[in-house]
Amino acid sequence: MSWSILELVRNNPDKLKEYIKRRFIDVSLVDRAVELDKKWRQTLQEVEKLRHEHNVISSSIPKAKPEERQELIKKAKELLKALEEKEKELDNIENERDNILMQLPNIVDDSAPIGPDETYSVPIRFWGKFKVYEKDEAEFLSQLKGNRVDYEIIHWKPVGHADMLENVLKLGDTKKAAEVSGARFYYLFDDIVWLDIALLNYAIDTMTSKGYTLVLPPYMLRGEVIKSVIDLDTFKDAIYKIENEDLYLIATAEHPIAALYFKEEIPKEKLPLKYVGISPAFRKEAGAANKDLKGIFRVHQFHKVEQFIFSSPEDSWKLHEELIRNAEEIFQGLGLPYRVINIATGDLGACAAKKYDLEVWMPAQAKFREMVSCSNCLDWQAYRMRIRYVEKGGKKGYVHTLNSTAIASTRTITAILENYQREDGVVEIPKVLKKYLEPFSRAPKDYIYPRKE
């Protein structure tokens, strides 16, 4: 939940219901939250009244006449017992209320397109020259949704990234990985590993040159923390839990960076605080049983560079645009054609009030595929983690948190394999990566060539 949500529960529950309806989920939790919050505030008044009465009587005992003292002591004990019982009742109501509130998603920004799923998301801009196989032109044009873009027709069918990796280049092995680890794992070799490393260094270099602080975060978080950063009920099919430990593997560096100021206060003049984290990402992908079974697009582990900002409330929307521009700059540097879409309300996830996705065109699949997710979470995470800003005069409020992918290495590799392949199976390396490969004598510099048996 967020402070914004708690304010709406108390002052405008109908508005909160409207936001939740936009997400196409049940609004009955709002009524229960309103009921419990009213009960909590009423009980709090009763606690404060009992506490006041107890304090008045307790302070009068030393001054009382001897014949009155015993009666006052008895009355004080009765009030103390009643107070303790009422405080316990208050705690129980508060816990029940907070459990309900923690299940409520973020509010929704008015600029997010309303719709139950991703088909209602709206493309807002395109970039690059798109390679389109001649038989896929009609399908490509249908995905533009009326927008005009620059594209070229190619007359040979591109090879899908999974076959390029394992059958043409012979630089990956998902079959052996499945044998020893299970589905959605992989071995990568030689040039593809160098490409992975170069992509990570390119993203880090780009972001640190903009003044973002580089972070290597913990790869596991305690239950209390991960439940504050995300809606764990929504993510239970995505997050790995360590058996017999109160620890969860992170699904992105967003999670530990968000927790960097867990239960702390930040001087407002220090905001915004901008970070770029690098980490492995671990995902169960339990909800994607039949999606992307081949290749390395949707896997249980990969490397990721993540942007993250702690912001003052008044600056968060401006910084949301900054984050997506940073991601676009990275993909423009790679020369990968893409579109940015404004995500529909039903596909936002609990944390985000608004989200952009950057999707690269994949010529072999004739589809746009997600490479970047960029969210403004307002104060939803900060309230749950108790991260506040403090003004010089002492006034406090909850910070806003924002996050965006910079690079998810394996997905970006799949985009390079499909967009930079030649008809003879050779893959050109994006020129921007050359400087990150040149220091290593065995690393490829310009091309990745198919391996012979």
From Swiss-Prot:
The protein's GO terms of the molecular function aspect are: ATP binding; serine-tRNA ligase activity
Query: Which Enzyme Commission number(s) are listed?
Result: 6.1.1.11
Q: What broad class of enzyme is this? A: ligase
Places the protein is found = Cytoplasm
Q: Which GO terms describe its cellular component?
A: cytoplasm
Residues binding ATP: 283-285, 299, 370-373
List, in alphabetical order, the GO biological process terms annotated in this UniProt record: selenocysteine biosynthetic process; seryl-tRNA aminoacylation
Q: In which pathway does it act?
A: Aminoacyl-tRNA biosynthesis; selenocysteinyl-tRNA(Sec) biosynthesis; L-seryl-tRNA(Sec) from L-serine and tRNA(Sec): step 1/1
Give one Pfam hit by family name: tRNA-synt_2b
**Which reactions are catalysed by this chain?**
tRNA(Ser) + L-serine + ATP = L-seryl-tRNA(Ser) + AMP + diphosphate + H(+); tRNA(Sec) + L-serine + ATP = L-seryl-tRNA(Sec) + AMP + diphosphate + H(+)
Entry binding sites for L-serine = 252-254, 306, 405
Highest taxon, organism lineage: Archaea
The UniProt subunit note reads as follows:
Homodimer. The tRNA molecule binds across the dimer.
Please provide the record's free-text comment about the domains of this protein.
Answer: Consists of two distinct domains, a catalytic core and a N-terminal extension that is involved in tRNA binding.
Q: Which family does it belong to?
A: Belongs to the class-II aminoacyl-tRNA synthetase family. Type-1 seryl-tRNA synthetase subfamily.
Described purpose of this protein according to its UniProt entry: Catalyzes the attachment of serine to tRNA(Ser). Is also able to aminoacylate tRNA(Sec) with serine, to form the misacylated tRNA L-seryl-tRNA(Sec), which will be further converted into selenocysteinyl-tRNA(Sec).
Can you name this protein? Serine--tRNA ligase
Which gene produces this protein?
serS
